[in-house]
Amino acid sequence: MSDDYDPTNINAASWEEQEDYGEADGSEQYGEAEGSEQQDIQHSSEHQEAEYSVESNPNDLGDHPSQDGNTDDVGDDYDPASVVTSSVPAPPSAPAQEDSKTAPQPAAPVAKKPRTAGGFLVGDSDDEDEDGDDDGEPQQQQQQQQQQQPHQVVHKETGSGASSSGGSAPAPASASATAAPQSHSPAPQTATLTVQDNAGATTFNAPPVPQQVSHQSGATTAAVPTTPSSAAPAVDPTPVTQPAPDRVAIYEDQIRDDPRGAMNAWLELMKEKRARNDIDGARQVYERFLAIFPQAADIWVEYLDLELSLNNFPQAEGIFAKCLMTTPNVNLWTRYLDYIRRRNDLNDSTGQARQTVSQAYEFVIDNIGLDKDSGKIWAEYIQFIKFGPGTVGGSQWQDQQKMDQLRKAYQRAICVPISNVNTLWKEYDQFEMGLNKLTGRKYLSEKSPSYMSAKSANTALEHITRGLNRTNLPRLPPAPGFDGDQEFMEQVEIWKKWIAWEKSDPLDLKDDKDQPGLYQKRILYVYNQALMALRFWPEMWVDAAQWCFDNNITTVENKVTKDGNANGVEFLIRGIEANPESVLLAFKHADHIESTYPIEENDEAKIQRGEAVKAPYNKVLDTLYAMIKSLKEKEAAQIAKLQEMTAAQESKAGSDNEDGDGAADNIKKAPIEAIQKGYAAQTQLLSRMISFVWIALIRAMRRVQGKGGLNVPLGGMRKAFHDARARGRLTSDVYAAVAQLEWTIYKDPAGGKIFDRGAKLFPEDENFTLENIKYLHSRDDHTNARVLFETVVNRLTQKPELVHKAKPLYQYFHKYESQFGELAQVTKLEKRMAELFPEDPKLAAFTARYASDKFDPITARIIVSPTTQLRPKNMIMPSIEQQQPQLPMSQRDTPAAGFSPRPQGLKSPSAGPGAPFAPYAAKRPLDDRDYDDHPRKIARSEHDPFVRGASPLKGAAGRRLDQQRRMGGAAGAYSGSGAGSQVAPIARDITFLLSQIPRVEFYDSHRLNPSRMVSLLQNVKVPEYLDWKRERERMQQMQQMQGDGYGGYGGGGGGGGGGGYQGGGHARNISQDYAYRESPGPLGGRPLSPFTGGPGSRLASATAAYRQAPVGRPESSGSYEPPPAAQYGVPPPAQYDGGWAQQQQQQQYGQPPAPQGYRYGNPPPPY
């Protein structure tokens, strides 16, 4: 076949007829075709540059000539442009716009009086004498003209079409677009509303319009003047407000431009139709919408409500027939149940109606009873059975039948993970135990595992679907990086988690023999639910189809069978209908057809198989080509609209704007170029999509039908390549792929000719040139490879904007010369690369000589000294404050000392009167800026440095502290020293607490909100010292008064600091733990406890022996002190008002003395 195949010539049949390949290609014909194509597009070289239009760029698209004009090809009759059918003619301009452009528009300068007739401008006078004559016109004539104008408009609307005056003049060019049809064709007296769009005209008849309404509506229509233009002077006409555009027309325009993306326009249009009581129009809108969104259950429900509100039961049943089986939605199926119950009266004596409703319930539960939101339907079904004929527990056959139906319904419902499964289980328990406790326990024990599985599954399902939006109004997925992309992908991930959870079989249904196929049915149901929300996400369609193929699963009449092809293909077909532009779905469908189609050796079977495989490819190609055509139409419309607006602005400005023509032209061209660039980017993306679809089709045809040819029944690969060139919009990838197939598989020299043709079409495509050089190297044609390399890189480097394209060519050729060439050639290439790409590292090219894709011997480091080169870095454990992100600097003022919730300590003598207090005798003056914002353990080097004074500690403690500071020990963290400082160790109690807290990945309980916890601690009210002292004294006085009423305390305290009773007193002595509890007052003047003897004291004299005893508090913060034994003593009898209340009262206000030797900062504030 290599002798008679010309891949570059569409019409030629053999290579022998065209021996001059590469020398003559009919450039004259191509030039004519190219000119004709440009004529169709109506893009002039003076106003539009080629690089802004992908269609006119020969370097990026299909079979087009090179820029140098050389279009060598095989045959004289070969015309690549003649087979490219992707050119889009410019849309014809509207007649009204043509009139506005061709008709003369008189100018009306401000300084001159315009000449008008009938309220419209008809001329302009530059002569002062004429203006004087106009001023002499009587004012009555103007009033008569103004009175006659509405009358003429009414006549035009009522169909007379003739003016009362004899003369008539054409309407001025500035008239609105709606005036043209009124002036040429009379309108009927009955008003007709016509909404005109590209799809057609939709006409709605309305009642006759009164004449007054016509008069008002016709005020904006150009009236026929009754007098000549020079008759009356011009009085400035009052500006007439244009009527607001019809909302229906606006919504229709949005839907026409973007039917799948204008969801809000669809919804508003339906709402508007219903508000206007336009039933027929609403039906049409519903049908159009549901053709695009066939699983929009909410819109189906609205459509049903519309028909049922009009009692159109046949139409409602037709709607149910269309949507019920394809839309598994609980709300929609609930409406079906409501309709069945509405049409069947349960009071029927024959019982036929109840039987129909019962069958409807069974039908609904079989289809959507698996839904996690179907609990209401299950509950209604059980109630329907309960209120049926018969008595539960009776002995009649009807009673027994009712009992069996209830038991069956309960046993089915409690196995489904629904929200009310607990309620249904309780009802089932009562039902069984009410009949017979012995048999009831048996049934309950049998169904208890299923119920527990359903209960736990419902909990897990609620956790998985938290945040899921189960919408049935799908939206197009936002592009990555644009608004809504993260939210959309989050919804996709939640659906995937739900599907994966169902596949994990949490209900143990895979091996359930009582319910065969229920496991597969649940998974298919979740896939259908996901596709209702993700209709425009092709990956979900492919995932569902692939699962059916892998598991050989499908459903026939709601029963699972073992024929997965039907259901999987159905998913693919439905996905392609929803996403006709999806390349993924097309490839998957074609791949499945190719792998499952029967294989036979005869030519007829191969032809049929090839046609079946080509069908998905052709469908997606048609869609992509149509999208490019639509883009070109939108581009032309936007440019025309922009030019029209620019022209209107220039006409308003007049001749006052006399700026330079060059600057004005640049300003006008800038927005047009921006529009062209935007559409060019979209068109380029679609062109690459089309090219890769053609590559996939060519490869598939080679597998199915072989190499093929143009004039043979089995076209194969070559016929597919011919069709691709005929349709156009190809990139260089197609030529490179076909050439590689020709040479790699068949060793046919046609591959080289395809490369030659591609080199002429894409002379500046670096990727295609790179593949061409590799092809020449594979044929050992090193000379031509070098020539091609030098030619292309010289062409690219001559243009500064294309220098970057030469880099991959240099890199490949440098690598090739390094491996197989001479050192002199390698050195020359490196010098050229250094001049062209100075930003690259100097050793990058030299290193690339000896490196491979797997290892680079130059950059790899050899370990000479492990002790020196492999020394681990010092890992310093950061403090708690360093582990947390640094808080921003506070913007508030430091609170005053008197209002601070901290314990009020003594101020430093060196501190000024306005300085904040230093808790517990600070050793140095503190900075008064942002005192509360610095973390306790933050490195002071990050803030203002300070000089620490001499330590007030003397003796051994002072020497130890000074030694630690000199050695850079723990004290360095507080002194703000440099790198030698170490972080202060964490207290043992805190370390123990942190060790008990589980790791975050293993903690699945309730999590505290840190910000709210900090806010709670900030809002805790800590009393001031003076207020606390005053309150304590008041409570002491109250306790003394109560003690005086019960009698005094005697001596002789009990063991363990308890104390004894004396006289009529009933209060026992307070233990030592609370007797020495102090207030959070200043350390300098520590008050004595009021409970330690003295006049008026209520304590027994035995407690005085413990006054001078040292406080039994440990010095270490990590030690533990057991409570005194008196705390665990036996309380006094209940009938006596003993000492427990007093002990609790003292416990509320008393505090133990704070230890003086805290090692890690100040003691905490009081409780």
Curated annotation (Swiss-Prot):
Could you list this entry's UniProt keywords, alphabetically sorted: Cytoplasm, mRNA processing, Nucleus, Repeat
Matching entries from PROSITE patterns are given as:
TPR_REGION
Query: Where are the compositionally biased (Gly residues) regions?
Result: 969-979
Composition bias (Pro residues) maps to 1121-1134
Show the GO cellular component annotation of the record: cytoplasm; nucleus
Question: Composition bias, kind Acidic residues: at what positions?
Answer: 16-26, 70-79, 124-137
**Which Gene3D superfamilies does the record match to this protein?**
1.25.40.1040
Q: Where is the composition biased (Polar residues)?
A: 192-218, 882-893
InterPro entries from the xrefs?
Answer: HAT, Rna14-like, Suf, TPR-like_helical_dom_sf
- Listed Basic and acidic residues bias regions: 924-946
Subcellular location per the Swiss-Prot or TrEMBL entry:
Nucleus; Cytoplasm
Q: Which domain of life is it from?
A: Eukaryota
Q: Where are the HAT repeats?
A: 277-309, 311-342, 352-387, 401-434, 471-504, 518-550
According to the UniProt entry, its GO molecular function terms are:
mRNA binding
Q: Where is the composition biased (Low complexity)?
A: 102-111, 138-150, 159-191, 219-245, 908-922, 1079-1090, 1135-1151
Residue ranges, annotated region (Disordered): 1-245, 882-980, 1075-1167
User: Quick one: where is this thing mainly located?
Assistant: nucleus
Cite a single GO BP annotation.
RNA 3'-end processing
The record's section on PANTHER family has: CLEAVAGE STIMULATION FACTOR SUBUNIT 3, RNA CLEAVAGE STIMULATION FACTOR
Reported function: Component of the cleavage factor IA (CFIA) complex, which is involved in the endonucleolytic cleavage during polyadenylation-dependent pre-mRNA 3'-end formation.
Name this polypeptide is given: mRNA 3'-end-processing protein rna-14
Gene that this sequence comes from: rna-14
